[in-house]
């Protein structure tokens, strides 16, 4: 088998939900190592790609995190409130543009020098979202608002 040969074929999709984002069921054939094609089906949730940033202060040795309510976590037995880095969906912006805006919206800090760290898929077994991770140094002078966004 050639490295560039297709390993997936005959993809069919069925829309299951588009209430908030898109949930689809895909049926496809996957080429196995023994050369046989095997039909499989999977559901995939598509909510778009996102970006995450960890703000740090080297001098104070601190980071800025936000506290947000996450309903899916709540229905899994947790109180629903998570401590996390500022993040948001790209919504047609570049990862760099979006994360600068999200950092200010959620934390109140306006950062200008962001550094990409890595990209990763959130939960690749069922979600299409790719996350772009960044870091940025902040100081007290970078504070332009209370932040908050949707954070509680």
Give the positions of each predicted feature.
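Active-site-adjacent beta-strand/loop module that shapes the phosphate/pyrophosphate-binding cleft
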Residues: 27-34, 123-144
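Phosphate-/nucleic-acid-contacting segments
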Residues: 112, 151-152
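Beta-rich strand-turn-strand
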Residues: 92-97, 106-113
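A short, amphipathic edge element
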Residues: 1-14
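Acidic, metal-coordinating catalytic segment for phosphate/diphosphate chemistry
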Residues: 15-60, 74
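Conserved Nudix-box catalytic region and its N-terminal flanking loop in Nudix hydrolases
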Residues: 42-45, 54, 59-101, 118, ...
